[in-house]
């Protein structure tokens, strides 16, 4: 569908889709500019863009006064990459992404997508095969065994460890006694304060089994 309007400036607008008696209005994802600068793209191509994690993946942001999520993934050999999720009925035709010419990064800002939304990338490769892939830079994933990515808001937690981080810089392990206590943190959910126990028994450090989710819950995370 296409329409040409006799206007010099692009006005604020919405699309409205009618399916029988159902009407759905939404923003146009393609009216928003790319959030990755040319300088950042050149640094990425040179292998020196050390903050790629701030742009690649899925990041809830405000763009042009509209809240949504910015998606970006590197897929240089793909013919097409689309975002599919519960916000577009998992239909790869609805949100094909922009391809950045130098790097092969595909990117798109999708208005209205919030933290908690499930998504994947639908990738069309040479030969016409279509695959769905999880986000390699994703910050959330559904509970195993699902591998579907989840949009996550990372800015909500306020760290309070500035003084401790400064003190840590002065620590030289080879000059002081070290006694390490290894444990699974889930064991301490039922047994009170771990820190109090460590101080009482004289341990200086603690080594946790993996605290992030791992695939085989019976493995204790040793293969993580």
Regions found by a protein language model. Give the residues of each.
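Short beta-strand elements bearing conserved aromatic residues within extracellular beta-rich modules
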Residues: 81-83, 119
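Conserved, mostly hydrophobic/aromatic
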Residues: 73, 121, 183, 198, ...
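Aromatic-lined carbohydrate-binding/catalytic grooves of carbohydrate-active enzymes
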Residues: 198-224
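The feature marks proteins involved in alpha-glucan
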Residues: 1-70, 100-182
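The substrate-binding groove and active-site-proximal loops of carbohydrate-active enzymes
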Residues: 184-189, 224
């Amino acid at each position: 569908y296409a329409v040409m309007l006799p206007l010099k400036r692009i006005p604020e607008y919405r699309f409205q889709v009618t399916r029988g008696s159902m009407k759905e209005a939404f923003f146009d994802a393609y009216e928003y500019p790319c959030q990755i600068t040319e300088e950042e793209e050149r640094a990425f191509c040179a292998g020196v863009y050390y903050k790629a994690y701030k742009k690649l993946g899925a990041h809830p942001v405000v763009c042009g006064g509209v809240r949504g999520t910015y998606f970006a993934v590197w897929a240089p050999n793909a013919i097409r990459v689309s975002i599919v999720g519960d916000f577009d009925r998992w239909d790869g035709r609805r949100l094909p992404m922009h391809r950045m010419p130098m790097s092969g990064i595909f990117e798109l800002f999708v208005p209205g997508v919030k933290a908690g939304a499930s998504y994947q990338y639908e990738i069309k490769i040479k030969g016409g095969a279509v695959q769905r892939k999880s986000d390699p830079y994703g910050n959330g994933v559904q509970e195993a065994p699902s591998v579907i990515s989840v949009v996550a808001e990372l800015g909500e937690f306020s760290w309070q460890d500035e003084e401790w981080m400064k003190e840590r810089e002065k620590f030289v392990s080879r000059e002081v006694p070290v006694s390490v206590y290894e444990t699974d943190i889930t064991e301490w959910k039922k047994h009170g304060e771990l820190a109090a126990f460590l101080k009482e028994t004289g341990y200086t450090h603690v080594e946790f089994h993996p605290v992030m989710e791992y695939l085989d819950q019976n493995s204790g995370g040793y293969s993580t």
